[in-house]
């Protein structure tokens, strides 16, 4: 454990094309092996496809998708007297954004479309319409928290 406390959060620069921090975070989640320009090409291509299919601002579509994917509750393991309980806890706002982006990207990778641009675009569109694997993951997470509500008094 570090003695100086938690590392400070570095400021996030706005995206040069859309002027949105959310797009920057999405680019960083898509990023593999330090290939930032490739990640940007994938994200911008996906957002452009989303614009063509919906006819609306892609950042608005992305935000709507994020609102549908962001979890408000999750379960954390807590050991009490030799038993491990799944304790439901509220998710911090920054963690909910991180989880939503992680789920969007990971479930787009698992899709069947040909290119990553198409996969990401379709996952964002599905999520903005309340469909898709990322939204299902959020619902499963909430269901799990609801099922373990009896252990909520073990929160820390």
From Swiss-Prot:
Part of the 30S ribosomal subunit. Contacts proteins S9 and S11. This is Small ribosomal subunit protein uS7. It comes from Mycolicibacterium vanbaalenii (strain DSM 7251 / JCM 13017 / BCRC 16820 / KCTC 9966 / NRRL B-24157 / PYR-1). GO terms for cellular component: small ribosomal subunit. The lineage of its organism: Bacteria, Bacillati, Actinomycetota, Actinomycetes, Mycobacteriales. The keyword rRNA-binding applies. It holds the Pfam family Ribosomal_S7. GO terms for biological process: translation. PROSITE patterns: RIBOSOMAL_S7. InterPro entries: Ribosomal_uS7 (IPR000235), Ribosomal_uS7_bac/org-type (IPR005717), Ribosomal_uS7_CS (IPR020606), Ribosomal_uS7_dom (IPR023798), Ribosomal_uS7_dom_sf (IPR036823). SUPFAM superfamilies: Ribosomal protein S7 (SSF47973). One of its GO terms (molecular function) is structural constituent of ribosome. Keywords: Ribonucleoprotein, Ribosomal protein, RNA-binding, rRNA-binding, tRNA-binding. One of the primary rRNA binding proteins, it binds directly to 16S rRNA where it nucleates assembly of the head domain of the 30S subunit. Is located at the subunit interface close to the decoding center, probably blocks exit of the E-site tRNA.
């Amino acid at each position: 454990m570090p003695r100086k406390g938690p590392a400070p959060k570095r400021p996030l620069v706005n995206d040069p094309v859309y002027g949105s921090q959310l797009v920057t975070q999405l680019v960083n989640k898509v990023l593999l092996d330090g290939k930032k320009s490739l990640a940007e090409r994938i994200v911008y291509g996906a957002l452009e496809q989303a614009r063509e299919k919906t006819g609306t601002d892609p950042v608005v579509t992305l935000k709507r998708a994020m609102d549908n994917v962001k979890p408000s509750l999750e379960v954390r393991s807590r050991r009490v007297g030799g038993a491990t309980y799944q304790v439901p806890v509220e998710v911090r706002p920054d963690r909910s954004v991180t989880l939503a982006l992680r789920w969007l990207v990971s479930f787009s990778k698992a899709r069947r479309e040909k290119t990553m641009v198409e996969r990401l675009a379709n996952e964002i569109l599905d999520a903005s319409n309340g469909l898709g694997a990322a939204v299902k993951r959020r619902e499963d997470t909430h269901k799990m928290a609801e099922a373990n509500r009896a252990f909520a008094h073990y929160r820390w």
